[in-house]
Amino acid sequence: MEKALSLVVFIIFSIMLASVENKVNANTCIEGIGNCQQCDVRCKARHGPAAKGACDSKFQLCTCNYPCGQGPSPPQPKKCYGGAGICSDRCGAQCCNQNCAQKYNQGSGFCDSIGNTSLCKCQYNC
């Protein structure tokens, strides 16, 4: 009777352990992130401290295992550059910035000297 009870407890414990393991594995996502150089460090930088990078020695590829839902942040918008004329005593850095803000969506401007000429350069989201 005591052996049967021990066996039942062991079976229940094994089922519980397998169930927990499946739940953990079900929430793990995988991403290939290139070569093996600093695999674990790059994986953690991309997906947080719970992520684990593993290198496939045969193919020299890094695979990142991380908890699903904790992926990389959305990509930042691409930056484009344009011009808004010449910077001068009459239109300096503040004027340049205002011109770029009016000319481009979410634009900002700065004066950049090239030789004897100071150009108003704009940076904005493409």
Swiss-Prot record:
Subcellular location: Secreted
Keyword Chaperone applies: no
UniProt record, GO biological process: defense response to fungus; killing of cells of another organism
Keywords on record: Antimicrobial, Disulfide bond, Fungicide, Plant defense, Secreted, Signal
InterPro entries noted in UniProt: LCR
Gene Ontology CC annotation, any one: extracellular region
Cystine residue pairs: C29-C68, C36-C55, C39-C62, C43-C64, C80-C126, C91-C111, C96-C120, C100-C122
Record has tRNA-binding as a keyword: no
Protein name, UniProt field: Defensin-like protein 183
Endpoints of the signal sequence: 1-26
Domain of life: Eukaryota
Family per record: Belongs to the DEFL family.
